[in-house]
């Protein structure tokens, strides 16, 4: 893989609430449908790509900022082998909730989802690029980076935070199915057991689960295992131990699935 197509990750132990990623040439970078436990925001810095966000799919280009709330299924991929580049930030939702409620008495409300899935705001685009540059600057210590992050996400909140999400119809039995997967994803999870926990038939569960979570139960299970693997990699766990612990057949299977979801190998993601 050309060096330009290699993902670059940035993390700082003094700023555990934020992680950054950059791709300079995304022509050979392909994502499967996936979601994160954190809030994600990114900017297309050159070229264009497809942007799938739950039920919608469109082409976006340089200057576009994309936003994904925790749990929202998405994927960005190249358009017909055309070059494109981007930066991404992954932000702890609880930390972001503190920004959202810094000027009100809603400290106990938690993170409020952002309704916008993308924006052409030039201020947000420029602010995101500037924040990324400051985060990766080795000459800066943690304090100015933290201040820059607070300033940017306050700008995001002022720009987009007052819009409201369309309320989704939630089936509590389907929620119970997802909870069962979350509780047992480290072991063997069979569809029959999920159905029993949710008191739903297999046919209904598969249809209703995909409608609510934009993934099949199996895809949700694999995505949950990948989320766990990311956390373990950040903590320094070995790839072979993670593969065994998270229920993958072997290390090679884990490597393939991880790369399919995140367009990076576990070795590239690992600090």
Regions found by a protein language model. Give the residues of each.
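Residue-level signal for well-ordered alpha-helical positions
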Residues: 79, 102-103, 159, 232, ...
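Terminal helix-turn-helix DNA-binding modules in bacterial transcription factors
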Residues: 179-193, 200, 210-255, 271
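Histidine-centered active-site/metal-ligand motif
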Residues: 33-36, 74, 204, 218, ...
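Short, Lys/Arg-enriched, Trp-marked, Pro/Gly-tolerant hinge/linker segments that flank
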Residues: 107-123, 133-198, 211-223
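Short hydrophobic/aromatic patch on the recognition helix
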Residues: 63, 204-209, 253-254, 258
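N-terminal regulatory/effector-sensing and dimerization cores
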Residues: 2-109
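Short, basic/aromatic-enriched C-terminal tail that caps enzymatic domains
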Residues: 19-21, 256, 261-271
């Amino acid at each position: 893989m050309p060096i330009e197509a290699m993902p670059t990750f940035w993390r700082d132990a003094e700023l555990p609430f934020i992680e950054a990623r950059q791709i300079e040439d995304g022509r050979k970078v392909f994502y499967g449908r996936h979601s994160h436990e954190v809030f994600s925001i990114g900017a297309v810095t050159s070229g264009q790509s497809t942007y799938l966000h739950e039920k919608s799919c469109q082409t976006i280009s340089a200057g576009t900022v994309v936003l994904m709330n925790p749990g929202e299924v998405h994927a960005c991929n190249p358009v017909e082998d055309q070059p494109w580049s981007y930066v991404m930030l992954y932000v702890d939702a609880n930390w972001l909730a503190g920004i959202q409620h810094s000027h009100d008495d809603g400290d106990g409300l938690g993170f409020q989802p952002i309704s916008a899935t993308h924006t052409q705001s030039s201020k947000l685009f420029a602010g995101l690029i500037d924040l990324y540059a400051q985060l990766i600057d080795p000459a800066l210590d943690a304090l100015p980076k933290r201040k820059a992050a607070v300033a940017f996400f306050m700008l995001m909140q002022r720009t987009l935070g007052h819009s409201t999400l369309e309320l989704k119809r939630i089936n509590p039995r389907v929620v119970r199915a997802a909870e069962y997967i979350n509780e047992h994803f480290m072991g063997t999870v069979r569809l029959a057991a999920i159905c029993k926990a949710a008191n739903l038939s297999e046919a209904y569960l598969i249809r209703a689960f995909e409608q609510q979570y934009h993934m099949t139960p199996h895809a949700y299970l694999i995505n949950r295992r990948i989320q766990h693997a990311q956390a373990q990699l950040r903590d320094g766990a070995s790839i072979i131990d993670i593969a065994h612990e998270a229920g993958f057949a072997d290390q090679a299977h884990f490597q393939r699935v991880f790369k399919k979801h995140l367009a990076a190998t576990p070795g590239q993601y690992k600090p």
